[in-house]
Regions:
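N-terminal active-site segment of His-dependent metallophosphoesterases
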Residues: 72-125, 195, 202, 222-223
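N-terminal amphipathic/hydrophobic targeting modules at extreme N-termini
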Residues: 17-31
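Extended active-site neighborhood of metal-dependent phosphoesterases/phosphodiesterases
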Residues: 118-212, 227-247, 255-312
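Bacterial N-terminal signal peptides
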Residues: 54-68
């Protein structure tokens, strides 16, 4: 495994995913022959034309599905959520979201910070996080949040995740997944250092990936009332926008919110903007929304779940999946290229 300037990486071949399509209804309209059967020979001319068209369409759909199946199977799938380990409950919600991740069988599981409440102590990680989300620790790509830093230096977080947390590199790192380049950012202390910004800019300059994604804890944009939009993330957004990043994933607000692609000033930019998902729904109690801010497209609270993304060669599909398996938001979008 070969992380960019750190340690491990995940590599998979991503292909374009074929969107599900329903087969057209085939109208047979077969006329009785007088011998107790319904046969094509007795069709009207218009019915025969409809049948021929339907057969051709069905054959084309079958061929498309046949040749697309390997592409769908090969596209990397990620899950993402933050605000996870809710301490002290015997049947805490993170048990349900962990089972959901296991059922999805992702290529990689991204955590979006505040992995363990209330203070990110190692003992709490072992008692709460490890029996649930720790079941897929081997595919987890974590970032820390402010609650992880309630323990000095986020020691519990770094000790629990070990090399996967990249302590020696300041807790930030990057890796490739199929056609995508992903950057894990450390916003746990509440701000992004100039050294980290420089590293992120240089890392993205070296990337030749078609599609790019960055993830961290504190959202630049949010309609939530507990924290809301974080101005301290503005410089980071500017760097990511300047390097053509496609998607950002955050936690911190304990709800789900999807934004239109946005510029650094928060204006909609369908062609060059960055789409942000806030997914603070991993297990900690929910937070309410205020009035939607510009660019907000979907808001869901009082729910636990994860974001599922399929990383295609030139785009992505997304679905917010509740802990009960119900999909509450989904769509697809192309990469900037």
């Amino acid at each position: 495994m070969n992380d960019h300037h750190t340690s491990a990486s995940i590599s998979a071949t991503a292909h374009r995913e074929l969107a599900p399509q329903g087969e057209p209804a085939v109208s047979r309209d077969l006329a009785p022959t007088g011998e107790g059967c319904y046969c094509p020979a007795a069709m009207s001319e218009s019915a025969m034309v409809r049948l021929r068209i339907a057969v051709v369409v069905a054959a084309l759909l079958f061929a498309a599905l046949l040749f697309a199946s390997p592409a769908v199977a090969g596209a990397p799938v990620i899950t993402a959520a933050g605000d996870i380990g809710h301490q002290g409950e015997p049947d805490a919600p993170q048990r349900r979201t962990a089972r959901l991740v296991l059922s999805i069988e992702p290529t990689a599981a991204l955590t979006l910070g505040d992995n363990q409440y209330p203070d990110g102590e190692l003992a709490d990680f072992m008692a709460s996080y490890d029996p649930t989300w720790g079941r897929f620790k081997n595919i987890t790509r974590p970032v820390p949040g402010n609650h992880d830093y309630h323990t000095a230096g986020a020691d519990g977080y770094f000790d629990y995740f070990g090399q996967r947390a990249h302590r020696s590199n300041g807790g930030y790192y990057s890796f490739d997944l199929g056609a995508w380049h992903l950057v894990a950012v450390n916003s746990g202390p509440g701000s992004i250092s100039n050294a980290q910004l420089d590293w992120i800019r240089d890392d993205l300059l070296r990337s030749d990936a078609m599609c790019e994604l960055a993830y961290w804890h504190h959202p630049r944009w949010s309609s939530g009332t507990n924290h809301g939009s974080d101005q301290d993330m503005a410089a980071l957004w500017q760097v990511l926008y300047g390097q053509g990043v496609d998607v950002v994933l955050n936690g911190h607000e304990h709800n789900y919110e999807r934004f239109a692609p946005l510029s650094p000033s928060g204006d909609r930019e369908p062609r060059t903007g960055i789409r942000e998902f806030v997914v603070g729904t991993g297990g900690a109690g929910s937070y309410p929304f205020g009035d939607p801010i510009p660019g907000s497209q979907r808001r869901i609270t009082d729910v636990f779940g994860v974001l599922r993304m399929t990383l295609q060669n030139d785009g992505y599909t997304w679905a917010f999946v509740r802990a009960n398996g119900r999909v509450s938001d989904n769509g697809h979008h192309g990469c900037h290229g």
